[in-house]
From Swiss-Prot:
Cellular component GO terms held in the UniProt record: cytosol
Subcellular location: Cytoplasm
Binding site for FAD: G13, G14, G15, H16, A17, G18
InterPro entries: FAD/NAD-bd_sf, GIDA_C_N, MnmG, MnmG-rel, MnmG-rel_CS, MnmG_C, MnmG_C_subdom, MnmG_C_subdom_sf
Recorded superkingdom: Bacteria
GO molecular function: flavin adenine dinucleotide binding
Role summary: NAD-binding protein involved in the addition of a carboxymethylaminomethyl (cmnm) group at the wobble position (U34) of certain tRNAs, forming tRNA-cmnm(5)s(2)U34.
Protein name: tRNA uridine 5-carboxymethylaminomethyl modification enzyme MnmG
Binding locations of NAD(+): 279-293
Annotated family: Belongs to the MnmG family.
Protein species of origin: Variovorax paradoxus (strain S110)
Length: 652
């Protein structure tokens, strides 16, 4: 049957990528359909019950700054919040939250069901409708054909998924859900380059059988015994949105645990060749950890509550595909878990992914127009990476329906830009996870300023509603106004008593400074600075903690950030210069055969993307630029002229 309505955007899959893709496209006015094999699992946290972390929290904040759902859903569902790296610089501080699975899923579903321009439909997709070189819709398992101008595929671990527990294995998308075998076969027919990856999950435990007196309590920020204040994830969030807070607990593996794990190596699918897919380097299975770090006597295991209305606990750190009898023994070998009852066995899952180097910068596939990929299908791991990709693909699918150019954030603008750029230029050999270390401009890509970097762009795209825009505008204007006020107030040895200077600054000042300069000093904060000379320099109206934080960080890191801006500008002269789609790299005789081969294979859209392909040297980029300019290629020279004209314009 051909469904009587046609859509602008069809999103296949209702996980973290799919929900953000559907919400983004619909917010932009595209008539959107979200197809899921089970509406009850929309927004489900398939593995760990947490959101955020180093690098990941930055992505969540960016999704939020663009109007996405993940951060605000976490504020409504979070049962423990912590700021990681709180003693380090602001660039690497990151928010992490434990979430109640039921509350999180409900928060996401509520937004999906109440989003204008978005329809939901429960059916697994078995086929894509392709006419010529363009996708025109999707077909479900009962033969319902939905036509659309674009399709965003967010299939997660479902593509030809196979679960492994010991030497036993069976087809599944995740525990309790069927795999997408027909869809996987259809994608292989389309000759899209694919591979296999794997991920895993630990056994779940019944909290009633855990002896917490033998474990170490880990309180969240804002809880008794924790640091404070209690964080929020969304720029529109408040601490009073959070439900009841709960502690996590810490136990450890030991020599006996390790011996038990080793005794199961001969029945491990990892070590017997049953699993071909590569697992995530930074979230290895417990058997992989024991094998790789044989000299380590113990590993921390975090016991994380799954929610407020369940006794289920997630033992973070023992993801495993070992046989169940080994899982049973290894769990009971740890302090506090001697009598632990396993509710669900751990398992590994293998699934298809597709080489992200075959995607355009917009995440549209090169070979099939209108078909976008997002999430684990691109070789990534993690809820946060999936959500960011989904939002990005949803934006660009909607823009294509409008006939507009794709939105492409740069590496110096967003972690989302780093994520996209890494995937399409470097590809993956293992599941990709975001870290702050992947961003060369991380001083300006902080959690605290994600809205300052992206909300204006989100407003122009149609992603940001009036309430968020008004809140952002007030914050932006307040920070700007107060920063300028601090720059305009000057103090010197004559008008600032020495005793006051020593109290706030640690020593008397020797010449004239403005207050912004004084705020740059490491030991000076805004609050103490405003107490100078009886508070005569304080602002007329009080500022929020968030506004003060933004002012302080901007002042203290201004020198470093200015240097990073200079680096960005030096690279910008070729970053966005577009390469002709039909360019023949064999014409550039001075390029090595290897470089010509790689450029011809990847067909980078800009010189910046070309420069980040493995094996393409700076010298090769210079040769390419010289050849294009000498050759007088119209498209290239037009872009170069546009860039030069833009650079010559005075700042507005």
């Amino acid at each position: 049957m051909l469904y009587p309505e046609e859509f602008d955007v069809i999103v296949v899959g209702g996980g973290h990528a799919g929900t953000e893709a559907a919400l983004a496209a619909a917010r932009m006015g595209a008539k959107t359909l979200l197809l899921s094999h089970n509406i009850e699992t929309l927004g489900q946290m398939s593995c760990n019950p947490s959101i955020g972390g180093i690098g990941k929290g930055h992505l969540v904040k960016e999704v939020d700054a663009l109007g996405g759902a993940m951060a605000i859903a976490t504020d409504e569902a979070g049962i423990q919040f912590r700021i990681l790296n709180s003693s380090k610089g602001p660039a690497v501080r990151a928010t992490r939250a434990q979430a109640d699975r039921v509350l999180y899923k409900a928060a996401i579903r509520h937004r999906l069901e109440n989003q204008p321009n978005l329809s939901l439909f429960q059916q697994a997709v078995d086929d894509l409708m392709v006419e010529g070189d363009r996708v025109v819709g999707a077909v479900t398992q009962v033969g319902i054909a939905f036509r659309a101008r674009t399709v965003v595929l967010t299939a997660g671990t479902f593509l030809d998924g196979r679960i492994h527990v010991g030497l036993d294995n069976y087809q599944a998308g995740r525990a309790g859900d069927p795999p997408a075998v027909s869809l996987s076969a259809r994608l292989k027919e389309l000759k899209l380059p694919q591979g296999r990856l794997k991920t895993g999950t630990p056994p779940r435990l019944d909290g009633r059988s855990i002896d917490f007196s033998k474990c170490t309590e880990q309180a969240g920020d804002g809880m008794p015994g924790g640091a404070g204040p209690m964080p929020v994830f969304s720029f529109m969030g408040r601490a009073d949105m959070h439900p009841q807070q709960m502690p996590c607990w810490i136990t450890h593996t030991n020599a006996r645990t390790h011996d038990i794990i080793r005794s199961g190596f001969d029945r491990s699918p990892m070590f017997t060749g049953k699993i071909d897919g590569v697992g995530p380097r930074y979230c290895p299975s417990v058997e992989d950890k024991i094998n790789r770090f044989a000299d380590k006597e113990s590993h921390q295991i975090f016991l994380e509550p799954e929610g407020l209305t369940t006794n289920e606990y997630y033992p973070n750190g023992i993801s495993t595909s070992l046989p169940f009898d080994i899982q049973y023994q290894l769990v009971r070998s740890m302090p506090g878990l001697e009598n632990a009852h396993i509710l669900r066995p751990g398992y590994a899952i293998e699934y298809d992914y597709f080489d992200p180097r075959e995607l355009k910068s917009s995440f549209e596939t090169r070979s099939i127009k209108g078909l976008f990929f997002a999430g684990q299908i691109n070789g990534t791991t993690g809820y946060e990476e999936a959500a960011a990709q989904g939002l990005f693909a949803g934006i660009n699918a909607a823009l294509q329906c409008r006939g507009e150019e794709a939105w492409l954030p740069r590496r110096d603008e967003a972690y989302l830009g780093v994520l996209v750029d890494d995937l399409i230029t470097k590809g993956v050999t293992e599941p990709y996870r975001m870290f702050t270390s992947r961003a060369e401009f991380r001083l300006q890509l902080r959690e605290d300023n994600a809205d300052m970097r992206l909300t204006e762009a989100g407003r122009k795209l149609g992603l940001v509603d009036d309430a968020r825009w008004d809140a952002f505008s007030r914050k932006r204007d307040t920070v700007s106004r107060e920063t300028e006020r601090l720059k305009s107030i000057w103090v010197n040895p004559r008008n600032l008593p020495a005793a006051e200077s020593e109290r706030v600054l640690g020593k008397a000042i020797e010449h004239e400074y403005n207050l912004a300069d004084l705020l740059r000093r490491p030991d000076v904060n805004y609050e103490t600075l405003m107490s100078l000379d009886g508070g005569k320099y304080s602002a007329g109206s009080p500022l929020s903690e968030i506004e003060i934080e933004q002012i302080e960080i901007s002042a203290k890191y201004s020198g470093y950030i200015e240097r990073q801006h200079d680096e960005v500008e030096r690279a910008a002269h070729f970053e966005n210069l577009r390469l002709p789609a039909d360019f023949d790299y064999s014409q550039v005789k001075a390029l090595s055969f290897e470089v010509r081969q790689k450029l011809d294979k990847h067909r980078p859209e800009t010189l910046g993307l070309a420069s980040r392909i493995s094996g393409v040297t700076p010298a090769a980029i210079s040769l390419l630029m010289i050849h294009l300019r000498k050759g007088g290629h119209k498209a290239f020279n037009r872009d170069a002229a546009t860039e030069a004209a833009a650079e010559s314009q005075p700042a507005q």
